[in-house]
Regions:
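Flexible loop/turn connectors
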Residues: 3, 10, 14, 25, ...
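Alpha-helix N-cap/loop-to-helix initiation residues
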Residues: 38-39, 71-72, 100
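Alpha-helix N-cap and loop-to-helix initiation/capping positions
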Residues: 6-10, 41-44
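An alpha-beta-alpha
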Residues: 18-58, 63, 166-183
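Short beta->alpha junction loops
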Residues: 64-73
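Small/polar loops that bind or transfer phosphate-bearing groups
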Residues: 33, 41, 67, 95, ...
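Surface-exposed cleft-lining segments at the edges of enzyme active sites
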Residues: 4-6, 32
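Alpha-helical elements of Rossmann-like donor-binding domains used by nucleotide-donor carbohydrate transfer enzymes
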Residues: 17, 21, 44-51, 74-81, ...
Length: 185
């Protein structure tokens, strides 16, 4: 919102950084996303994935993009749809870790070896991604730091009579965490 302080995650950069790692060992990509009505997770992450794939002359076929709804069940069902239609996909990126865990469950139940046959990654560095086998490659967002920055901005707003002196927008960083679901690990 214009005129208001904002601390936010760089979802586009997160997807770019993750996809740059995945293209090193992937050829045919699938992507499980959420609605484009969600600016950050829906649009920004998908744009980041598409940018890197395009730069690497990899086509993300529209039939290989499935739209889910943030749940384990959705990841499971969308993986089922994707791999039933396109069993040659060797790399799956999901907009969230939760959907990636659901997708990984479907893959394992149906005899796919992760990462040998299909490498998979999500975003968010959730607890679930750390306990499934193989452990999920992901993007870590600095949520704790975001909270501390938000508190600082709030204190500055309370203590300052001039709102223009308070930094208005802070874009947080992120880092890719390569785990066993990526072929290089």
């Amino acid at each position: 919102l214009d005129g208001y302080p904002c601390i936010f995650q760089d979802d586009y950069k997160a997807a770019v950084n993750l996809t740059e790692q995945m293209v090193k060992t992937g050829k045919k990509f699938g992507y499980i996303t959420v609605t484009d009505k969600d600016e950050a997770v829906g649009r920004q992450r998908k744009s980041g994935v598409e940018k890197v794939l395009g730069e690497n002359q990899i086509t993300l076929e529209s039939e290989c993009v499935k739209c889910g709804n943030f749940t384990l069940e959705s990841g499971y069902e969308k993986a089922k749809e994707l791999f039933t239609e396109h069993p040659d996909v060797d790399t799956l990126i999901c907009a969230t870790d939760t959907m990636a865990v659901g997708a990984a469950n479907w893959l394992k139940e149906n005899g796919y070896q992760i990462p040998q046959q299909v490498q998979i990654a999500g975003m968010g560095d959730s607890f679930l991604g750390k306990i499934i086998e193989p452990k999920l490659t992901t993007v870590h967002f600095f949520y704790k730091t975001s909270g501390m920055e938000s508190a600082k901005v709030l204190v500055d707003l309370i203590e300052s009579k001039e709102t223009s002196s308070v930094h208005k927008e802070i874009k947080m960083g992120c880092k890719v965490v390569l785990r066993e679901s990526h072929r290089n690990i």
